């Protein structure tokens, strides 16, 4: 029997530069099939370029919460008029209508089979693009495994470093984060499964170098810094080793928001984010100035 190599690529978040290197690495490793498990766009402003690469590589593509997020804003399930959503509006407006229609039609999970091995692939979970599956929710993972008519449950979403384990003889795999990994500066994560004769023979957790300075320059050239520097700086903190500063920013923003208004979510939200995090514009600007020492733009 011939061994089939399947690449699982998750959480690109618009980082076309990282994706380009991942696809080169996959080709060098003789990958036969590609599965993209969501969060293709939205965070870095290279959505069209990212989606064109994805579409030309595979038809096995899922939506993540970031795609659902754009769809639901489009459907006016949230009010996105405050400052923290300016970059999201910019990235949505930059997408071609063809690519908007493409993400609208993406499924949130897939059941696939290679050489007799059944895979269930989702972004968050088989239930929702937003549901978290990680080590803290072991009971939930075990519940899905017990209900699973498949040999493997594969997902992303949490931006954990790549990991896998076997539960009741079934593979549970987090494919990591290809575009905005908080664990490795200038490295993209993805996974190659080698499948043969009804078995997963090998699980290769891949780390691929990409040029973070190219990402920085491409952000500058995109024009998004004229929209809202704060969020783009926070996003970049997440990939250049300053993730702690990013976490502290949002932790402090929540504290200040609660002190001043008593709530930190958007009332009346109708989408997947029932309690949508929302910070007043003055808090966003104030903390943006406070955290400038961590920013590169």
Locate the predicted segments by residue.
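Acidic, His/Gly-rich catalytic cores of divalent-metal-dependent hydrolytic chemistry
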Residues: 167-175, 179-297
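Active-site metal-binding loops of divalent metal-dependent hydrolases
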Residues: 10-12, 38-40, 65-68, 124, ...
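Glycine-rich phosphate-binding loop signature in dinucleotide/nucleotide-binding domains
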Residues: 26-31, 114, 146-149, 192
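Internal, conserved structured core segments that host functional sites
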Residues: 103-141, 145-148
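Anionic-ligand binding region
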Residues: 140-152, 156-166, 170-178, 188-190
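Core catalytic region of metal-dependent phosphoesterases/phosphodiesterases
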Residues: 4-102
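Active-site-proximal beta-strand elements of phosphoester/diester hydrolases
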Residues: 4-13, 118-125, 172-176, 204-205
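A short secondary-structure junction signal
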Residues: 124, 130-134, 164-167, 184-187
């Amino acid at each position: 029997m011939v061994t089939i190599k399947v690449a699982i690529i998750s959480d690109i978040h618009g980082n076309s530069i990282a994706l380009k290197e991942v696809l080169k690495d996959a080709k060098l490793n003789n990958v036969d099939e590609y599965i993209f498990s969501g969060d293709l766009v939205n965070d870095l402003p290279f959505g069209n370029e990212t989606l064109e690469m994805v579409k030309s590589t595979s038809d096995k593509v899922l939506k993540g919460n970031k795609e659902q997020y754009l769809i639901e804003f489009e459907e006016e399930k949230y009010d996105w008029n405050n400052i923290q959503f300016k970059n999201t509006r910019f990235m949505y407006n930059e997408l071609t209508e063809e690519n908007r229609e493409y993400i609208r039609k993406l499924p949130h999970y897939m059941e696939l089979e290679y050489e007799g091995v059944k895979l269930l692939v989702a972004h968050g979970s088989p239930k929702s693009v937003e549901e978290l599956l990680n080590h803290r929710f072991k009971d939930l993972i075990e519940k899905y495994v017990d209900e699973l008519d498949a040999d493997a449950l594969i997902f992303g979403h949490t931006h954990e470093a790549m990991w896998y384990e076997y539960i009741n003889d079934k593979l549970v795999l987090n494919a990591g984060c290809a575009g905005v990994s908080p664990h490795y500066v200038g490295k993209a994560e993805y996974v190659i499964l080698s499948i043969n004769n009804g078995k997963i023979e090998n699980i290769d957790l891949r780390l691929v170098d990409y040029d973070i300075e190219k990402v920085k320059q491409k952000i500058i050239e995109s024009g998004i810094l004229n929209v809202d520097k704060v969020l783009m700086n926070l996003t970049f903190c997440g990939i250049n080793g300053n993730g702690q500063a990013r976490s502290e920013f949002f932790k402090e923003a929540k504290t200040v928001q609660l002190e001043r208004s008593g709530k930190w979510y958007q009332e009346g939200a109708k989408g997947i984010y029932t309690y949508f995090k929302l910070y007043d514009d003055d808090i966003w600007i104030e903390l943006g100035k406070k955290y400038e020492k961590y920013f590169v733009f």
